[in-house]
């Protein structure tokens, strides 16, 4: 496997993917965000490459389209960290549900209260490699999750980075997402109002559904509750799924982040608070996928690592 080292904050940005979803025979009708994740059964050489996103991003859709950037040489980087002779190719993947464990490529989180799913795209990565191309991507995996020692240092307010495609906006020339830095509004490890979610102090718009939330400790990170070390540490903290709005009657409404051209009622005011499921829910879904690894061909692509 060929890997190219890039700065950590650049690597995690390369984990995102812009998702277009639609019905069979029709053009895409919704847009959302996903991120590449490598799920394995304890053996990193025997893994699946999936796109993690929200269930509501692909609900009612028969397929997704997304663009992957690849090159025959990731070592030759131009301005902005773009590989020389890069090739952007849009891929079409049919969503296969409830056929058989050997055929299905759609993995929903088993809880109806968790808006999280994964779509297996291992074959797409393999096809790129078979053409002697290397993928400009960072696959998030268990190494990007916080350890128990790192969780001990989590405070109520932490700096975070959210990468995605608000209102579908993206850098289409370079196939790059929009990245923003903000803070948590509630503790990322504590269930908000008894539900497995936390709040982020950041405006969340349509198209942001499925955006990864990273604990963004730059330029210093905590080694304990009271000690800091120079350097950076970025860990997956969760995934965006909703936002909080206020009605003209003063009621606070929780809504899924819209994925299509659905106008929001004028009497609703966005509170600039997003809702995210914690990384533990992603870990659970990855474990479910890992338990089925031996049923499919393994995939270990050439990647950018951090």
Regions flagged by a language model, labelled:
Residues 13-18, 22, 30-31, 46, ...:
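Serine endopeptidase catalytic core focused on the charge-relay Asp
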Residues 9-12, 215-306:
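C-terminal subregion of chymotrypsin/trypsin-like serine protease catalytic domains
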Residues 6-9, 37-39:
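Long protein-protein interaction modules used by eukaryotic assembly/scaffold proteins
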């Amino acid at each position: 496997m060929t890997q190219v080292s890039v700065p950590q904050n650049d690597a995690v940005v390369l984990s995102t993917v812009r998702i277009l979803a639609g019905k069979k025979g029709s053009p895409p009708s919704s847009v959302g965000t996903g991120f590449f994740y490598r799920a394995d059964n304890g053996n990193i050489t025997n893994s699946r490459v999936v796109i993690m996103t929200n269930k509501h991003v692909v609900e009612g859709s028969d397929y997704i389209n997304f663009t992957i950037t690849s090159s025959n040489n990731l070592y030759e980087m131009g301005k902005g960290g773009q590989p020389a002779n890069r090739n952007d190719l849009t891929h079409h993947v049919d969503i296969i549900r409830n056929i058989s464990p050997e055929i299905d490529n759609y993995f929903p989180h088993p809880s109806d209260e968790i808006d999280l799913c994964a779509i297996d795209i291992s074959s797409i990565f393999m096809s790129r490699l078979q053409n002697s191309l290397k993928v400009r991507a960072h696959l998030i995996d268990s190494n990007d999750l916080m350890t128990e020692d790192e969780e001990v240092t989590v405070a109520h307010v932490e700096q975070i980075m959210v990468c995605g495609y608000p209102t579908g906006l993206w850098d289409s020339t370079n196939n790059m997402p929009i990245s923003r830095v903000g803070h948590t509004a509630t503790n990322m490890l504590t269930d908000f109002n008894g539900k497995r979610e936390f709040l982020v102090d950041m405006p969340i718009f349509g198209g942001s559904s499925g955006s990864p939330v990273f604990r963004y400790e730059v330029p210093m990170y905590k080694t304990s509750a009271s000690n800091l070390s120079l350097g950076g540490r970025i860990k997956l903290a969760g995934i965006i799924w909703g936002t909080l709005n206020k009605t003209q009657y003063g009621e606070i409404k929780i809504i899924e982040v819209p994925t299509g051209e659905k106008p929001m009622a004028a009497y609703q005011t966005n509170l600039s608070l997003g809702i995210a499921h914690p990384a533990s829910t992603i870990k659970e879904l990855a474990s479910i996928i890992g338990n089925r690894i031996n049923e499919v061909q393994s995939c270990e692509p050439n990647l950018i690592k951090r």
